[in-house]
Amino acid sequence: QHIIYSLKPNGKAAVVVPTGFITAQSGIDKSIREYLVEKKMLGGVVSMPSNIFATTGTNVSILFIDASNKQDVVLIDASNLGQTIKDGKNQKTVLSSDEEQQIIDTFNNKVQIDDLSVVVSYDDIKAKNYSFSAGQYFDVKIEYVDITKDEFDAKMKGFSDNLEVMFKESKELEDEIKKQLAGLVYE
């Protein structure tokens, strides 16, 4: 809140927040997100990989507050980028130069990239309950694969056989539990 109120009329700020902040459904976190959207002062959000800071395992996101941005907002999910390395007793995630540049270019150019970034309007954010999580806006892709009747029948037989085995094991476990319970005595 202090940062928002300290900004000049067209000021900018970058704030590191716990990733839970960008999706919290109530409380001060949501109120701040609502304020940023209603006042149209959000440049974008980058969700970073876990362990990006070696001293904490907390997942963080970077909020880019931009009082001059009245148009679209870029949301980036960089959580799957980077490589985990051992740093003393801690593990940390390190981004390659190319990954860093990809994040910078995607953000600056407001580019939409499948499973990495989305460019959304303030109204889109309102419609998603003020969530700043890029994943909330990704298109769900379903791939259909054509199979023959024989392939279908074989898959169904496999599923049916597996189910039979599981039912049999379940019955055996049920019988064993009943047997154990019957053997319990009060002393």
Regions found by a protein language model. Give the residues of each.
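A conserved structural/catalytic subdomain of Rossmann-like adenosyl-cofactor enzymes
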Residues: 1-187
